[in-house]
Design a protein with these regions (language model features):
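N-proximal low-complexity "stem/linker" segments adjacent to membrane-targeting elements
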Residues: 1-25
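Short loop->beta transition adjacent to catalytic acidic/histidine clusters or analogous donor-positioning motifs
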Residues: 1-4, 24-35, 54-58
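Donor nucleotide-sugar binding loop of glycosyltransferases
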Residues: 12-15, 40, 67
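Acidic donor-diphosphate engagement hotspot in glycosyltransferases and nucleotidyltransferases
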Residues: 19, 44-45, 71, 95-97, ...
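A conserved acidic beta->alpha catalytic loop
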Residues: 22, 29, 37-46, 64-65, ...
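Glycine-rich, basic loop-to-helix element that forms the pyrophosphate-binding segment
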Residues: 44, 62-78, 99
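Short aromatic/hydrophobic "clamp" motif used to bind/position activated sugar donors
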Residues: 83
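Conserved donor NDP-sugar-binding/catalytic core segment of glycosyltransferases
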Residues: 95-127, 131
Length: 137
């Protein structure tokens, strides 16, 4: 397995559904998905189980501890060579993983990152803050 997507979730089953649907549309399929429920009152188990029939999805629950520990929980259980951590409100374009894979083959590295795409409704200030907080390292 080359890629492991870690998705920490807290009370966001609808967002998790949209993200899992975007992962299910990826053209490159060498990945697993770990959904880590962080003490949610609105669990997304049913959503995860629906997508587990379409792609490798593992679902975990744990007591609420915040995003950092929840990400680490997923990373500790990941089987991929690369770990990609996504917030539950992310939606990936269809060719995202294929583009990442092509770039990593052309220029191998141990870690990578980059900016999010700002939502169309963001003000210029929100776009600037979003870019500053998610820029390449």
């Amino acid at each position: 397995m080359k890629y492991s997507f870690i998705i920490p979730v807290y009370n966001r089953p609808d967002e998790a559904r949209e993200l899992l649907e975007s992962l299910n549309r990826q053209t490159l399929r060498d990945f697993e998905v770990l959904v880590v429920e962080d003490g949610s009152q609105l669990p997304c188990r049913d959503v995860a189980e629906t997508y587990a029939a379409k792609m490798p999805v593992r679902y975990f629950t744990k007591p609420n501890s915040g995003p950092g520990q929840t990400r680490n929980f997923g990373v500790e259980r990941a089987e991929g060579d690369y770990v990609l951590i996504l917030d539950s409100d992310a939606v990936l374009p269809e060719g995202y993983l294929a583009a990442v894979d092509a770039e990593l083959q052309a220029c191998p590295c141990d870690a990578f990152g980059g900016p999010d795409r700002a939502h169309a409704s963001f003000t210029p200030m929100q776009k600037a803050i979003n870019y500053a907080m998610t820029s390449f390292f």
